[in-house]
């Protein structure tokens, strides 16, 4: 039977109306069912991918700041099938997010990250019973009354740091060894005594870096467009990126490393975090040779301790920022030298009991962390319930981003925000500090991290003059301040020549190194 040709009207219905529907569906501001509030405003979106193509992989915080100047301090973007709400105002953080902590304390679901860590990394757990349990257990060894007992470990490792820098300028490796050894000592009961011991740490960092790079795809770039399109699961599994295969490989390698460390720590003499955690309610320390339950509990314990490593190592990156700030701002460095010399003198190393008399040194640290943040977009969160803010609807399950960089450079808070001015923190101690996050999702190790930063900074600047090596290219400040992605903003490499400020300082370092206590016996009785 001969088919009749389709009329123009029918063709219109078949072709044009579906396209029109999709355009309206994906570009019009979303409205929650049964409500009359719209999402916060934001840039126009494309079907399917939304604004994912507009978010740069590098320095995205400046693009978000540009948008917030147009759409306001609370705005939204669509990242494929995810709605992200971006806050760029300290007032909103303090008076809205902080007051609704239970709503804003979850994490966005990143399939690759969850798969690669087996859903056991506390930093990505959603708000709920498991996360609350892990937070309580980790807080038991990271509360201030406990972290003061780790100060002898920090004394030993920072003394060795100074001694190493007497004979090498390879400061990034020296910083990593120092901070890693503090963590390994209290967590597993073993020191990283020399640079050769960093090989195992390198493997762990390589795995964590690979996982973070894949997770980054959720927030920006062409890779995000590929992995975040709403496609059937069977098709996703056959995508060329083979994300599940990569995730399985990383998970197996990461688990093997963490479980091996945990097993060794359980039988090692003395006290450590692994042993402490294994005795808490809800956590087992099965050796994995018996039933499946034992394997799961050992693996859970291994990730609970191991997931703290990445957070602890942020201190080594922070110290690099502080050293860079010292190189680029010699007047501030001289003022810190003067303060350290007046309080400490030349006959001993700076110590924790000096902190109250070193306000400029502490202000220098705070200003360096504001001037060049390590997490300019904070740690992404997710809402566990719907909310309303300034007349806008924030849906349950939305990703929440805090533009830390925008807040740190808000002229209404920080006068002349692009200038490096440590004294601002002395004049106004209540300025917002966002390095360690906020609310229930604030970094659990912040007290220990603050101690490590203070002691290492005070000792490094007390002991050494720091300068670029002879013949080195000048530091391009813009390049160092404008680098990074949504999840991290680590500094590019740079060189420094460390020179003892006088023979007296060198003698104190060498004498202190010769009488270091046994740090493992110190940590055995926390």
UniProtKB/Swiss-Prot annotation:
GO terms for molecular function: heme binding; iron ion binding; monooxygenase activity; oxidoreductase activity, acting on paired donors, with incorporation or reduction of molecular oxygen. Its cofactor is heme. Its EC number is 1.14.19.71. Coiled coil: none annotated. Pfam families: p450. Signal peptide: none annotated. GO terms for biological process: verruculogen biosynthetic process. Its main location: membrane. It is an enzyme of class 1 (oxidoreductase). Cytochrome P450 monooxygenase; part of the gene cluster that mediates the biosynthesis of fumitremorgins, indole alkaloids that carry not only intriguing chemical structures, but also interesting biological and pharmacological activities. The biosynthesis of fumitremorgin-type alkaloids begins by condensation of the two amino acids L-tryptophan and L-proline to brevianamide F, catalyzed by the non-ribosomal peptide synthetase ftmA. Brevianamide F is then prenylated by the prenyltransferase ftmPT1/ftmB in the presence of dimethylallyl diphosphate, resulting in the formation of tryprostatin B. PANTHER family: P450, PUTATIVE (EUROFUNG)-RELATED, P450, PUTATIVE (EUROFUNG)-RELATED-RELATED. This is Fumitremorgin C synthase.
């Amino acid at each position: 039977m001969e088919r009749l040709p389709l009329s123009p009207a029918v063709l219109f219905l078949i072709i044009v109306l579906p396209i029109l529907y999709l355009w309206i569906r994906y570009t019009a501001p979303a409205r929650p069912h049964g409500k009359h509030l719209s999402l916060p405003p934001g840039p126009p979106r494309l079907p399917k991918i939304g604004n994912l193509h507009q978010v740069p992989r590098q320095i995205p915080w400046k693009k978000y700041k540009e948008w917030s100047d147009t759409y306001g301090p609370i705005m939204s973007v669509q990242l494929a099938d995810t709605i992200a709400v971006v806050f760029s105002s300290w007032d909103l953080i303090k008076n809205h997010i902080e007051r609704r902590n239970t709503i804003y304390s979850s994490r966005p679901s990143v399939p690759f990250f969850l798969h690669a860590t087996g859903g056991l990394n506390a930093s990505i757990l959603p708000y709920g019973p498991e996360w609350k349990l892990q937070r309580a257990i980790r807080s038991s060894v990271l509360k201030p009354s406990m972290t003061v007992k780790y100060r002898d470990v920090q004394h030993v490792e920072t003394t060795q740091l100074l001694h190493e820098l007497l004979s090498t300028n390879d400061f990034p490796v020296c910083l990593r060894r120092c901070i890693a050894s503090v963590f390994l000592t209290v967590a597993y009961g073993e020191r990283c005594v020399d640079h050769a011991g960093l090989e195992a740490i390198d493997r762990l960092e390589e795995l964590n870096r690979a996982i973070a790079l894949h997770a980054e795809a959720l927030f920006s770039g062409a890779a995000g467009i590929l992995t975040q399109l709403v496609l059937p699961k069977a098709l996703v599994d056959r995508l060329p990126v083979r994300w599940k295969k990569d995730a399985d490989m990383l998970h197996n390698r990461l688990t093997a490393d963490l479980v091996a460390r945990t097993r060794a720590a359980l039988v090692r003499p003395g006290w450590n975090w692994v042993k402490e955690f294994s005795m808490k309610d809800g956590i087992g320390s099965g050796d994995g040779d018996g039933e499946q339950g034992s394997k799961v509990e050992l693996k859970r314990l291994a990730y609970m301790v191991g997931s703290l490593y990445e957070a602890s190592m942020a201190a080594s990156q922070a110290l690099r920022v502080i050293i860079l700030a010292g190189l680029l701002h010699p007047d501030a460095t001289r003022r810190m030298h003067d303060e350290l010399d007046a309080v400490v003198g030349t006959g001993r190393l700076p110590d924790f009991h000096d902190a109250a008399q070193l306000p400029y040194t502490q202000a220098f640290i705070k200003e360096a962390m504001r001037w060049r943040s390590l997490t300019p977009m904070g740690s992404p969160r997710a809402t566990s319930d719907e909310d309303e803010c300034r007349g806008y609807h924030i849906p349950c399950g939305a990703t929440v981003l805090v533009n830390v960089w925008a807040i740190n450079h808000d002229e209404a808070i920080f006068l002349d925000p692009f200038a490096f001015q440590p004294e601002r923190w002395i004049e106004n101690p209540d300025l917002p500090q966002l390095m360690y996050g906020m609310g229930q999702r604030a970094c659990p190790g912040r007290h220990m991290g603050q101690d490590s930063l203070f002691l290492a900074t005070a000792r490094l600047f007390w002991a050494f003059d720091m300068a670029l090596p002879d013949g080195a290219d000048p530091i391009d400040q813009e390049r160092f301040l404008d680098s990074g992605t949504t999840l991290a903003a680590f500094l590019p490499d740079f060189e420094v020549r460390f020179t003892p400020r006088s023979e007296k300082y060198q003698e104190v370092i060498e004498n202190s190194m010769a009488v270091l206590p046994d740090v493992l016996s110190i940590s055995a009785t926390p």
